Amino acid sequence: MSQSGSVLRRNGFTFKQFFVAHDRCAMKVGTDGILLGAWAPVADVKRILDIGTGSGLLALMLAQRTDDNVPIDAVELDAGAAMQAQENVAHSPWPHRITVHTDDIQRWAPRQTVRFDLIISNPPYYEPGVECATPQREQARYTATLDHQTLLAIAADCITEDGFFCVVLPEQIGNAFTQQALNMGWHLRLRTDVAENEARLPHRVLLAFSPQAGECFSDRLVIRGSDQHYSESYTALTQAFYLFMWGVNGERIDGPDSASCCG
């Protein structure tokens, strides 16, 4: 991103309240994860599950957004990424709330005796095909180790009756994921289509499903205005995390604690 709202270091990102190192993770901190972590509904949440936590970004963002008594379980298959997530959590303000599990979610989930009000995932979405540079990156990007039907089934087994399961996906894949979820008995409750600017078609979609039927709220989020500054809606959604941003009028937007950062 140009005019990045977080401070980019060679090995990670510094946000307002925490630092995310990602040099040992196949998938780096990016706009998709930041959008999902800032967007997911957290009202009245009592327990959170992050499937495929990677660097721990989503778990850390949700810890910042929720009460201090809300525990977060973050499951990661890759041992290197899980270790880095554990280190990021240990250096954050919430080491007592976030537990990183180095495990396959397909093995971990059946052992759980509690259910989760919020389940969140930035899942792999490419079908197996062209090889990636490393097995770790292939695991993070491709659905071979966790296909969408399996992910939806695991979430269904772990969620509370009125909980939300939230994902971010490319637009077309998100549409197919939604149909698959509906066929499995999920109900789409929130949908935000994300476009880079007003002139472009949406390229990402944020989705929230629930076992419970109800009205579906849909909207559109544009990241940048015609002047290439962040839009008002994107700024409102993410400014609790970014150290600074540039608003629609070109002003720098600082948070109250932007001078103090972790890492």
From Swiss-Prot:
It is found in: Cytoplasm. Signal peptide: none annotated. Its main location: cytoplasm. Its EC number is 2.1.1.223. GO terms for cellular component: cytoplasm. It is an enzyme of class 2 (transferase). The keyword Ribonucleoprotein does not apply. Specifically methylates the adenine in position 37 of tRNA(1)(Val) (anticodon cmo5UAC). NCBIfam families: tRm6a37MtseTrmN. This is tRNA1(Val) (adenine(37)-N6)-methyltransferase. It comes from Salmonella choleraesuis (strain SC-B67). The gene is yfiC.
